[in-house]
């Protein structure tokens, strides 16, 4: 059994195969996942797991250099936005519209679906390097 925090084998596999600038998304339970993207469905019931639990656990395993958020996130879900900023630290944030974010999902290695029900609880993580 793995000793690290992340136990989900599908998510662990995708992260281990990611290279510099590859992208993975984490979304709420309503985010439409394109057919072209690998779906990693973690949602069990409403609210479980949360978006932030999933983001924090993913960041234990994945080095990131940038995140992409919908412009609407800050205005519609300000508490979530502040929590994201706190968790990612000095990582660059790029803002695009929610519609552009949904289109960008097609370029992600995978889209992780959580049980989150907070509006705009969606993020795209761009992989960095550890050296």
From Swiss-Prot:
Tell me which residues bind substrate.
28, 98, 120-122
What class does this enzyme belong to in the EC scheme? isomerase
- In this protein, the active site sits at 20
The main location class comes to cytoplasm
Q: Enumerate the InterPro entries for this protein.
A: D-ribose_pyranase, RbsD-like_sf, RbsD_FucU
Gene Ontology molecular functions: D-ribose pyranase activity; intramolecular lyase activity; monosaccharide binding
- Name the catalysed reactions: beta-D-ribopyranose = beta-D-ribofuranose
Subunit: Homodecamer.
Name of the featured protein? D-ribose pyranase
Q: What gene is behind this protein?
A: rbsD
